[in-house]
A protein has these predicted regions:
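Glycine-rich, low-complexity intrinsically disordered segments
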Residues: 1-151
């Protein structure tokens, strides 16, 4: 699904599908920021005492996914709270596949997709609030997931 080209794509046209199936076009929430999409493969270092070379072997270890942060203005919806409440209540079906689509400049095509498999909210923060402030009231959501797929 990725659409390669010579010139890099801009970062500001993206859609987030929270995986609850309630959106008419697949997107349940607009976010201002989405950061830290990533994965790593850990490495275990190992060496026998009788090795000929004075170096360690690097053995492929476990896969790890980074926690993703989503930020948006407060819109008065309790959908994210309901999802978090399901998770903290121990509901086993509360895990979702969250999909992030990067779009081209004129919003006519998805050029890259990241799928966060078995995702769950692990942190929700609202604020800050300031009586003299003029900024938008914000909320921040942190997602943990078990596997990342890219298309």
């Amino acid at each position: 699904m990725a659409v390669p080209r010579e010139r890099p794509y801009v970062q500001f046209n993206f859609l987030v599908d929270l995986g609850d199936g309630k959106g008419t076009d697949g997107t349940q929430a607009g976010f201002q920021e989405c950061s830290n999409i990533g994965m790593e493969v850990t490495v275990a270092e190992y060496r026998n005492g009788n090795e000929v070379e004075n170096s360690v072997r690097k053995i492929t270890g476990l896969n790890k996914s980074t926690d993703v942060t989503l930020k948006r203005g407060v819109i008065g919806s309790l959908n994210l709270y309901s999802w978090l409440n399901d998770i903290r209540s121990g509901k086993q079906d509360a895990y979702r596949t969250v999909t992030i689509h990067l779009q081209n400049e004129d919003h006519t095509a998805v050029v890259q997709t990241w799928k966060l498999l078995r995702a769950r909210i692990i942190k929700h923060v609202s604020g800050p609030m300031n009586a003299k402030g003029t900024d938008v009231a914000m909320e921040e959501l942190t997602l943990s997931y078990e596997r990342l797929e890219m298309e």
